[in-house]
């Protein structure tokens, strides 16, 4: 089972700056992730919050709840949440950071991820497919013992 976590403002997908983030809503993204997970033999649980503390608690509790991995879109917390970085580092599960947009093609302040150093990798810039690519990676690595590349 993979926990898919989405941070602040992702509840506005499809309505907030669709020229930047696309027209896929959060509900549609959840359905896509469930379908992709099923294709890959992975169960997924999909959550979203606008609160940094809630996101941190979910990361901290994921292992105890029986999840095998986390797919994380921290939203703007990517760029400044050292508390989230510490939470990722403090738990044993593999985490893949995802972003709908290409961080390096955005404004200067969005080009740096403070959370990335604690993650196995980042998938950025492929819209909803960023989530699928993260799930493909996790399906492959969990299948071979979780070591990854």
Curated annotation (Swiss-Prot):
The record marks 16 as: Transition state stabilizer. Its EC number is 4.2.1.10. The active site is at 21 (proton acceptor), 99 (proton donor). One of its GO terms (molecular function) is 3-dehydroquinate dehydratase activity. Keywords: Amino-acid biosynthesis, Aromatic amino acid biosynthesis, Lyase. The keyword Nucleotide-binding does not apply. Substrate binds at residues 73, 79, 86, 100-101, 110. PROSITE patterns: DEHYDROQUINASE_II. The keyword Glycosyltransferase does not apply. One of its GO terms (biological process) is aromatic amino acid family biosynthetic process. CDD domains: DHQase_II. InterPro entries: DHquinase_II, DHquinase_II_CS, DHquinase_II_sf. It catalyses: 3-dehydroquinate = 3-dehydroshikimate + H2O. Pathway: Metabolic intermediate biosynthesis; chorismate biosynthesis; chorismate from D-erythrose 4-phosphate and phosphoenolpyruvate: step 3/7. Catalyzes a trans-dehydration via an enolate intermediate. Homododecamer. Belongs to the type-II 3-dehydroquinase family. This is 3-dehydroquinate dehydratase. It comes from Thermus thermophilus (strain ATCC 27634 / DSM 579 / HB8). The gene is aroQ.
């Amino acid at each position: 089972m993979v926990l898919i976590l989405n941070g602040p403002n992702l509840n506005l997908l499809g309505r907030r700056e669709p020229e930047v983030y696309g027209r896929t809503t959060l509900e549609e993204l959840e359905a896509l992730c469930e379908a992709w997970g099923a294709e890959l033999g992975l169960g997924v649980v999909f959550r979203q919050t606008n609160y940094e503390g809630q996101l941190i608690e979910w990361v901290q509790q994921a292992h105890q709840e029986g999840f095998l991995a986390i797919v994380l879109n921290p939203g703007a917390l990517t760029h400044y949440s050292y508390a989230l970085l510490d939470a990722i580092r403090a738990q044993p599960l593999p985490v893949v950071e995802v972003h709908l947009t290409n961080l390096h093609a955005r404004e200067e302040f969005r080009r740096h991820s403070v959370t990335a150093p604690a993650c196995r990798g980042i998938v950025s810039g492929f819209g909803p497919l960023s989530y699928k690519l993260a799930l493909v990676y996790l399906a492959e690595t969990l299948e071979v013992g979780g070591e990854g590349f």
